[in-house]
């Protein structure tokens, strides 16, 4: 009989938010992919992921504990700043 698949990380809101943020950072070229490869800048994907985080922040307002609210707020803000910086770097 096959062994059940075990999750690598806990399945909770903070882990999901961190996963989205990490993927956005990879798309922005701010961190390597999980295999260590440096991927090309992908502003479209980064913007989409940042927009998803912003939507989650709005839709979950009042339903998160303090640490979850601080996490999503700070990550969304930092990613928006990084996105603007990346846009400026590619247009100039």
Language model feature labels by segment:
Residues 1-51, 55, 66-92:
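N-terminal intrinsically disordered, cationic/polar leader segments
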Residues 60:
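Acidic, glycine-enriched active-site microenvironments
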């Amino acid at each position: 009989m096959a062994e059940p698949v075990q999750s690598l990380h806990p399945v909770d809101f903070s882990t999901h938010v961190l996963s989205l943020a990490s993927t956005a950072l990879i798309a922005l070229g701010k961190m390597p992919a999980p295999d260590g490869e440096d991927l090309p800048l992908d502003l479209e994907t980064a913007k989409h992921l940042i927009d998803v985080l912003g939507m989650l922040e709005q839709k979950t307002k009042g339903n998160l504990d303090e640490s979850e609210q601080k996490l999503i707020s700070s990550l969304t803000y930092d990613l928006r700043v990084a996105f603007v910086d990346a846009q400026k770097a590619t247009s100039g």
